[in-house]
């Protein structure tokens, strides 16, 4: 189970890294608004901003998370 999580996180991290390079070279910026809840006439909106720096940050966070999962698997296996 840990190896599947590790591989999924590494692959998403790699794709985020490539996507950040694409955004940087083409100067893209995606602004996404999602209305989470709508009560009567008011709503709660969640806003996302995706640019090259945020995608690069997410790729490194996912890479570090995958390495933590890999290390924990190795640490648990070595204790027995």
Swiss-Prot record:
InterPro entries linked to this entry: Proton_antipo_N (IPR001516)
Leader sequence segment: none
Record flagged with keyword Membrane: yes
Broadest EC class assigned to this enzyme: translocase
Superkingdom of this protein's organism: Eukaryota
Residue ranges of coiled coil: none
GO CC terms in record: mitochondrial inner membrane
Subcellular location: Mitochondrion inner membrane
Keyword presence, Membrane: yes
E.C. code: 7.1.1.2
Molecular-function GO terms, alphabetical: NADH dehydrogenase (ubiquinone) activity
Transmembrane segments: 4-24, 44-64
Membrane disposition: Multi-pass membrane protein
Main subcellular localisation: mitochondrion
Catalytic activity as recorded in UniProt: a ubiquinone + NADH + 5 H(+)(in) = a ubiquinol + NAD(+) + 4 H(+)(out)
Pfam families: Proton_antipo_N
Keywords: Electron transport, Membrane, Mitochondrion, Mitochondrion inner membrane, NAD, Respiratory chain, Translocase, Transmembrane, Transmembrane helix, Transport, Ubiquinone
Function: Core subunit of the mitochondrial membrane respiratory chain NADH dehydrogenase (Complex I) that is believed to belong to the minimal assembly required for catalysis. Complex I functions in the transfer of electrons from NADH to the respiratory chain. The immediate electron acceptor for the enzyme is believed to be ubiquinone.
Family named by the database record: Belongs to the complex I subunit 5 family.
Protein name: NADH-ubiquinone oxidoreductase chain 5
Organism listed in the record: Ceratitis capitata (Mediterranean fruit fly)
Lineage: Eukaryota, Metazoa, Ecdysozoa, Arthropoda, Hexapoda
Name of the gene: ND5
């Amino acid at each position: 189970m840990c190896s599947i999580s590790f591989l999924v996180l590494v692959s998403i991290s790699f794709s985020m890294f490539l996507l950040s390079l694409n955004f940087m070279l083409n100067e893209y910026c995606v602004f996404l608004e999602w209305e989470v809840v709508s009560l009567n006439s008011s709503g709660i909106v969640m806003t996302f901003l995706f640019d090259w720096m945020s995608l690069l940050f997410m790729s490194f966070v996912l890479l570090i998370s995958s390495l933590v999962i890999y290390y924990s698997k190795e640490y648990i296996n070595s204790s027995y």
